[in-house]
Amino acid sequence: MLSRLLPKIVSFAVFLPCFPLPAAESIQEGELGTFMGRADLEMHKLFEGERDPNIVVALDGTVVASWGEVEDNFALGKEGIRVRRSEDGGKTWGPLITVAKPCWHGGGVTVDEGSGDIFAFPEARYPPARKWVCRSRDHGKSWHKVEKAVIRPDHRGNVPDMHFAEHGITLRHGRHAGRLLRAARWYAGGDNRGNLPRMYNTAIYSDDGGVTWNTSEPFPELGTGEGAVAELSDGRVYYNSRRHADPPGSKYNPALRWEAWSEDGGLTWKDAAMCRILPDGARKSIGPGSGCFAGLVRLPVKGRDILLYSNCDSVTAERRDVTVWVSFDGAGTWPLKRRVWEGPSAYSSLNAGRPGTASEGWIYLLLEGGKSHRYEDGHLARFNLSWLLEGEETGDGKLPGWLDR
């Protein structure tokens, strides 16, 4: 009987359409042990001068570090967005590849875990500005404009700008699994001190593979910008935001970060609060236009919500000493930190390796830094969780009992 049915079954299978698997059906999360082992840290200089780091890990495990040119007068970036790739988990790095030019780097580089496509978001100049979407279908080797891509306004009629945000994510859990989501912001007409109190963070999301990008409801607090998002294992999305200005008469600690949550896949944000411990850059550089861009990632560990956050850890007014904080309970507490870069440094971006690839078990931090100036060069640190566990305890909560130290 089986021998008679087999040809028909095979014939039918040949004509089945091929669609990318939803991210939730893909094996994107592994075991805690892959991030453990012997404590290890390596440093690589990837870029000279310029700014704006974003780092992602392609579906095949290729690490893609992106960088953008910045002109002193906020003019057009002649060299645009460039990337360097590593196919061996970060040991060696290929040459510079141009994503788009001339342009500014909008950040929010996003890997679609269903199709493997990677999206980047150039802007014609310092925003507000014309913007477009670029895509790579070969893990960052080549890039092309998505001709039919559209970014829709929010309910207030405001089309957000892309510059600058931490890398985006693909949602893996719940009814919105497969959705692409990245932070974005509205500049309130221009980046000047008078507009700071009206600016707000937001997010854009795509349910059609990166062609149509809808804008979420605004972040609950004004004066925000340069956000980062991470999805927890229960499907909630955590939003961590830089602060540029607070309402008049505010009694908030001006050195700390805003955070909020989404339970609908990034459509709305609620429960905004000041994080108890995470610094918003140098603690004494507070004032209009203060704060600092930060990195954020959830380690792809099954059933665990280990979040990493990176920013300057300076008690002075100088941006320096990029440090990584660790939460083992999905941003409830941050009991551990370790400095990665000693000296002048600023913006940083975080990501983590994928199970079953050369990147597995590694954590990646791309930062601005140098010996004499914080914007001197672009450096890539790769390390593991064991290395972070040798850091110092912060007093904000305790290390979990399930953690094998």
Language model segments and positions:
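N-terminal secretory signal peptides that target proteins for export/translocation
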Residues: M1-L5
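Asp-box/BNR beta-propeller blade signature and adjacent active/binding-site loops
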Residues: A24-R405
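Generic N-terminal leader/processing signal
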Residues: L6-P7, M43
